[in-house]
C-alpha cells in the first residue's frame, strides 16, 4: 500500500518534473509541427522529444511521409526543447551528484560499486552459468522499488527475459525480506519474453512507450546476447550480428539517457581455444566483442567461490577501481557472504 502511495506521489510530481524528465512527443505540436507528422514519429517508435533530438537525420527521413525539409524542421524544433550544447564541468558534476544508485542487496557489493547500480547508464554482468547473474537481476527488480533513502529508485522495473529464467517466486522472497507487499512488487514489474533478436529489439520500442506513461527505475535484459548466439551462426554472419547487436545496445543507451533508468544486461562467456588461452589465468571471455565492451559503462565479471559464495570483479569502469567483492546467493536474494 505504502509503495502504491509512493508511486502515486511520484505521478503527482510529474508536473514539476516536466522540465527535468523526458518530454512527451506531443510537445512538438505546440512548436508548429503538424499533428499528423507527430503521429508518424510516434508510430515509428519516437515517444519523447529527446528521442527525436538524439536521432540522426537519415533515420527520420526513412519514416514514411517525412521529407528532408520536414526532418530538418522537426530536428530544429526538438533541439530548441532539449539542451544539447556545451555545459561546464561544474554543472555536469552537479548533475552527476544527483544520480540515484540502486542497492544490490549485498553491502560488500554496494561498497565495491560505491553505492550500487548506477541509473542513467548500462551495467553489464558476465560470467559462466551459476555465477549469480540472474539472481542479482531478480534482487534488483525488487530493490529498485524501495524508497531512495533505503537504497532504492522509487520506480518500477522492466524485465526482458530471453532465456526463460524469470521466476516471480524469487521476487516474492526478496519482497518479504524488505517488508514489501508481494502483490505490489509483482504489479510493479513489467515482464516480457524475447523470442528472437528482432523481437528483442521491438520490445525496446514498447519499453520506450511505457516509460513515457509511468516512472521506471530499472530495465533488465537477461541475457542480452543469448539469442544472438543462435540467430546468427558462423563467421559469415558475424558482421551482420555485430551490427544488429550494436543497434540494440544503442537503443538501450538511448533509453538510459532519455529516462534516466538503470540498464542492467547480462552476458555469456566463451572459452578461448587459441594459443593465448594456455597463458591466461582464466581462459573465459565475454561474447559480443568490442561492440558490447564499448557500449557498457560498467562491466562486472562474476565467478564462483566456495559453496554459495560468488565473487564479483570490476572488469571495466570509467570511475571505479579494479577490485573484488564477495557476495552470497540466499533464499531471499543476493546478500553478504558469511565468514
UniProtKB/Swiss-Prot annotation:
The modification Phosphotyrosine is found at residue 54. There is a cross-link at residues 58, 64 (Glycyl lysine isopeptide (Lys-Gly) (interchain with G-Cter in ubiquitin)). Residues 184-257 are annotated as: Interaction with PALB2. The modification Phosphoserine is found at residue 14. Residues 48-77 form the HhH domain. Keywords: Acetylation, ATP-binding, Chromosome, Cytoplasm, Cytoskeleton, DNA damage, DNA recombination, DNA repair, DNA-binding, Isopeptide bond, Mitochondrion, Nucleotide-binding, Nucleus, Phosphoprotein, Ubl conjugation. The nucleus of a mouse embryonic stem (ES) cells contains on average 4.7 x 10(5) molecules. This is DNA repair protein RAD51 homolog 1. It comes from Mus musculus (Mouse).
Amino acid at each position: 500500500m505504502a509503495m502504491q502511495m509512493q508511486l502515486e506521489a511520484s505521478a503527482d510530481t510529474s508536473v514539476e518534473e516536466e522540465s527535468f524528465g523526458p518530454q512527451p512527443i506531443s510537445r512538438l505540436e505546440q512548436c508548429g509541427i503538424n499533428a499528423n507528422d507527430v503521429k508518424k514519429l510516434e508510430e515509428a517508435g519516437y515517444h519523447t522529444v529527446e528521442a527525436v533530438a538524439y536521432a540522426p537525420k537519415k533515420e527520420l527521413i526513412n519514416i514514411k511521409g517525412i521529407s528532408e525539409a520536414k526532418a530538418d524542421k522537426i530536428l530544429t524544433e526538438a533541439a530548441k526543447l532539449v539542451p544539447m550544447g556545451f555545459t561546464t564541468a561544474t554543472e555536469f558534476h552537479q548533475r552527476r551528484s544527483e544520480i540515484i544508485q540502486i542497492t544490490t542487496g549485498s553491502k560488500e557489493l554496494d561498497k565495491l560499486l560505491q553505492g550500487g547500480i548506477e541509473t542513467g547508464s548500462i551495467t553489464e554482468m558476465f560470467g559462466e552459468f551459476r555465477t549469480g547473474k540472474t539472481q542479482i537481476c531478480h534482487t534488483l527488480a525488487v530493490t529498485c522499488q524501495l524508497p531512495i533513502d533505503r537504497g532504492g529508485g522509487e520506480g518500477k522495473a522492466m524485465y526482458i527475459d530471453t532465456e526463460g529464467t524469470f521466476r516471480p517466486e524469487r521476487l516474492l522472497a526478496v519482497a518479504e525480506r524488505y517488508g514489501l507487499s508481494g502483490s505490489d512488487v509483482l504489479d510493479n514489474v513489467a515482464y516480457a519474453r524475447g523470442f528472437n533478436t528482432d523481437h528483442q529489439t521491438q520490445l525496446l520500442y514498447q519499453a520506450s512507450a511505457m516509460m513515457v506513461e509511468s516512472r521506471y527505475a530499472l530495465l533488465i535484459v537477461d541475457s542480452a546476447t543469448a539469442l544472438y548466439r543462435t540467430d546468427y551462426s558462423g563467421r559469415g554472419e558475424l558482421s551482420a550480428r555485430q551490427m544488429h547487436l550494436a543497434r540494440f545496445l544503442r537503443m538501450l543507451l538511448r533509453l538510459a539517457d532519455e529516462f534516466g533508468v538503470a540498464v542492467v544486461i547480462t552476458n555469456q562467456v566463451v572459452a578461448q581455444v587459441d594459443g593465448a588461452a594456455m597463458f591466461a589465468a582464466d581462459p573465459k571471455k565475454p561474447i559480443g566483442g568490442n561492440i558490447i565492451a564499448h557500449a557498457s559503462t560498467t562491466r562486472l565479471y562474476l565467478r564462483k567461490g566456495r559453496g554459495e559464495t560468488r565473487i564479483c570483479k570490476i572488469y571495466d569502469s570509467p570511475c571505479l577501481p579494479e577490485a573484488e567483492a564477495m557476495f552470497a546467493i540466499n533464499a531471499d536474494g543476493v546478500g553478504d557472504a558469511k565468514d
